[in-house]
Amino acid sequence: MIFGFFSCQQPAEKQTKEMPMFCSWYTYNENEDFDSICRSFTELGIDGIVLKAGTAEEFRKTVPVAKKHGLTVYAWVWTINNHPIAAEHPEWLSYNRDGYSIADSMAYVGYYKFLSPIIPGVREGICKQVDEICKIEGIEAISIDYHRMVDVVLPTTIWPNYGIVQDREYPQWDYGYHPEMIKAFKEKHGYDPREQE
């Protein structure tokens, strides 16, 4: 898992909390009592929440609730994978080495819908999403996640979960071959990367 934190607020004059700080990941679900969950986090000694919400509007709704319970809020944002623009623009999704779009095939799990960052609209959509979330009052930082492609080779311990053996790189699991990516690669390097062994 690759992730990073990007601050959304001005630097504090001095640190007010003792270290270490204890945080928990949580994916917001409108069918759950978020107020009760935040209260439980506080009772358990959790200082902060790395919150995944589907939309900026959900962050606007949940952040004040978490803050009411004294929780520091970090937005947990998936960028390349399962981004809201994927549903609007399936043609922007990544292709595997066999030439199949992840829109039409599945890579391990159904929620693996990785966008191709060569597409200007993908980059613009991610920047817009991050910018909008950073402007939400009460969010301290953003944790960027899934800012990568599909795993080419999974850890051996989970092969049985998928009924696969990956003793080498297989083209059906090797993503990042969107036609626009191939075109840009050819222009820069003079050959098609799929021709390499």
Give residue ranges: language-model regions.
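Hydrophobic faces of well-ordered beta-strands that scaffold small-molecule active sites
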Residues: 20-25, 49-51, 73-77, 142-144
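Bacterial Sec-dependent N-terminal signal peptides
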Residues: 1-15
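Active-site-adjacent "subsite" loops/lids of carbohydrate-active enzymes
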Residues: 74-136, 154, 171, 193
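Surface-exposed amphipathic alpha-helices with a cationic face
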Residues: 42, 60-70
